[in-house]
């Protein structure tokens, strides 16, 4: 396992399956992933009132697209659907590890310890910057069968969940970056406009 969020997001060596979808994908993602500057990324998502086969199909397609793009997390708004749905797999090098499908996730507790870690995003390709977040969280959600679940998360998983949940509220990780010089430099290098960042610090 790599030491940085961005390194993990760049690596996808495995021969396993996840939700019957090969973790190693090649070519263009199955679904188009919206980029910084697209309005859909700034909208609040709506709760899913019924977990049915259409939601499970969407989750499978999101996983396929996430693996193809060599990511470790994807939120529905990133593919233009403003619903509270996330897919995450921080262990995609482990063929036996199952991905997480989080429906209507809600963080119920944040740990008091904060740490800074490098993040990247499939909606802002090529940009990797440090973001400060709580290192542990507790959350509740529904799984792909609609069953209520609770879990604790720490480390990379906790960070990835927080990162993807931000998307449900129209927030991107660049909005949380405190070093504006580094932010503007990275955005310019990758062809993004700093005016599309909405700082929340």
From Swiss-Prot:
This is Peptide deformylase. It holds the Pfam family Pep_deformylase. Disulfide bonds: none annotated. Belongs to the polypeptide deformylase family. It comes from the Bacteria. Keywords: Hydrolase, Iron, Metal-binding, Protein biosynthesis. One of its GO terms (biological process) is translation. The lineage of its organism: Bacteria, Bacillati, Cyanobacteriota, Cyanophyceae, Synechococcales. Binds 1 Fe(2+) ion. Fe cation binds at residues 121, 163, 167. It comes from Prochlorococcus marinus (strain AS9601). Residues 1-21 are annotated as: Disordered. The gene is def. One of its GO terms (molecular function) is metal ion binding. InterPro entries: Peptide_deformylase, Peptide_deformylase_sf. Gene3D superfamilies: Peptide deformylase. Its cofactor is Fe(2+).
